[in-house]
Design a protein with these regions (language model features):
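Sec-dependent N-terminal signal peptides
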Residues: 4-12
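A structural "domain/chain start" motif
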Residues: 14-96, 170, 196-199
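N-terminal post-signal-peptidase region of extra-cytosolic proteins
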Residues: 22-25, 57, 103-110, 137-142
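Envelope-exposed proteins and targeting segments
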Residues: 33-38, 80, 118-123, 146-153, ...
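Feature marks short, surface-exposed loop/turn motifs that line or immediately flank catalytic pockets
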Residues: 46, 131, 174
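Short secondary-structure boundary motifs at beta->alpha junctions and helix caps
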Residues: 60, 142-198
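Extracytoplasmic/secreted envelope proteins and their assembly/folding machinery
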Residues: 65, 69-73, 107-111, 187, ...
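Short, solvent-exposed, polar/charged sequence segments at loop or secondary-structure edges
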Residues: 79-136
Length: 199
């Protein structure tokens, strides 16, 4: 796969937004064959590790997977390149068939999912960070400033071959934007790069 790296650093009088994105494209894949896609809820791991009292921590909102999946679906729908199945329609269709998005995340049986939704490819993702990063003091108080951090990966997978068509890695931080605003900016800029490379 061909890889593109994009680094952004926006400075203003009151804040700095750091953005790093990696874009991987499978150059050998016949991209024109992908016409209709569906975005399923991104995987949000449960971190059961106990961290040091003095180590930096980043919270992950429990609904981060659904939020980022919806943002990604909306951004892809703007392209006009794909027919994107509405996120609500995906949820309702799977519910009618007594299926859950979580089941496909664990089994990665995208062929069955593709048949159920009538799509050529599915967009899957994994959330690694989505919230505020802080370093606790021994007293239990937080050190300032608090920094919003988001980090996640997105992959477009062919439902027939399970082959990755393209993938992006998005990571960023901000001292002023909340996780939703920051994610929206990151997705918009990263997918603009992806669109350019695919055309």
């Amino acid at each position: 796969m061909k890889k593109y790296a994009v680094l952004f650093l926006l400075l203003s009088s009151c804040a700095a937004i750091n953005k790093v994105s990696d874009v991987d494209i499978n150059e050998n894949f016949p991209h024109d064959e992908i016409q209709k896609i569906a975005v399923i809820m991104f995987e949000t791991p449960v971190d059961e590790k106990k961290s040091s009292m003095f180590s930096s921590k980043t919270s992950i909102a429990p609904d981060a997977g659904a939020i980022l999946a919806s943002m990604t679906a909306r951004e892809l729908a703007k392209w006009g390149k794909y027919v994107v199945v509405n996120r609500q329609a995906v949820e309702e269709e799977l519910k009618l068939k007594n299926l859950k998005e979580d089941d496909f995340l664990h089994t990665q049986n995208y062929l069955n999912l593709g048949k159920q939704l009538g799509v050529d490819a599915v967009i899957v993702g994994r959330v690694e960070g989505f919230g505020v990063s802080y370093k606790p003091k021994s007293t239990g108080m937080f050190l300032s400033p608090l920094v919003t951090k988001v980090s996640f990966t997105v992959r477009c997978v062919d439902v027939t071959t399970n082959e990755t068509i393209w993938a992006v890695k998005i990571k960023g931080s901000s001292t002023t934007d909340n996780e939703r605003v920051l994610s929206s900016k990151l997705i918009s800029e990263t997918f603009a790069t992806l669109k350019t490379k695919l055309n």
